[in-house]
Amino acid sequence: MSDATRARIIAIANQKGGVGKTTTAINLGAALALEGQRTLILDLDPQGNASTGLGVDARNRDLTTYDLILEDTPLAEIIRKTSVENLWIAPATTDLSSADIEMVANENRVFMLKDSLANRATKDFDIVLIDCPPSLNLLTINAMVAADAVLVPLQSEFFALEGLSQLMLTIREVRQTANPALRIEGVVLTMYDQRNNLSRQVEDDARETLGDLVYATRIPRNVRLSEAPSYSIPVLEYDPASSGSQAYMNLAREMLDRHLATA
Ligand code: ADP
Ligand code: MG
């Protein structure tokens, strides 16, 4: 990393639920960690699926991202090591579902996460991946304000691109106000099915509209990806040879190559 005092922060966002945000956070995180990047997944979804999927028991989440944002608890006190070397998680619980409302009252409301990550709080990491909730609410805005870039998982399904224009509008608004330097890291096609016309159609449309922003790597629909969370491990540990594992390793490498090329 060029700036050793803090990590590169990437918000994984899409206001649609079930498009692969959490799956991407867990498995891209694990893949980056295997590539030697010290990686933190910051769970910003009250459902806490990334936390559960990485083995943080719901009964064992004393300090969470809620405390980070609303109680000024230092990041170092809430992070947990995962089963993967170089991979940590800042867990979330349902507490976070009320955070949105509590944050509205604060005049600093869109900068609360950014402030929590200031003062070299992320200096021990190379990359922080923020798993956003399925909404363009204040939590997601906080993630975009704190982030260097947004990574967008795009489900290879009908209507995928319609939701995207709303997301792009929000990114533009954040740029015009609280975070002018916010970039789009890239758009990754998820749950891709080579044999399905619709998948190919979504891919063609996405590449035509978004050009190089769309990663060459596509994440295939792979049952191993949906099974791994019930074992509390990333697919790279559950089934390293699976197509899902291979795809997330390829995505990690593509991301790192791109970054090195533009650094
Ligand atoms: P989001 O975080 O955007 O709501 P998830 O990552 O939780 O989406 O994915 C929604 C569901 O789809 C989960 O059950 C997950 O296991 C499954 N899933 C995600 N990506 C894939 C994939 N590439 N292949 C098969 N199942 C997937
Ligand atoms: Mg999720």
Provide a role label for each language-model segment:
Residues M1-A263:
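P-loop NTP-binding core
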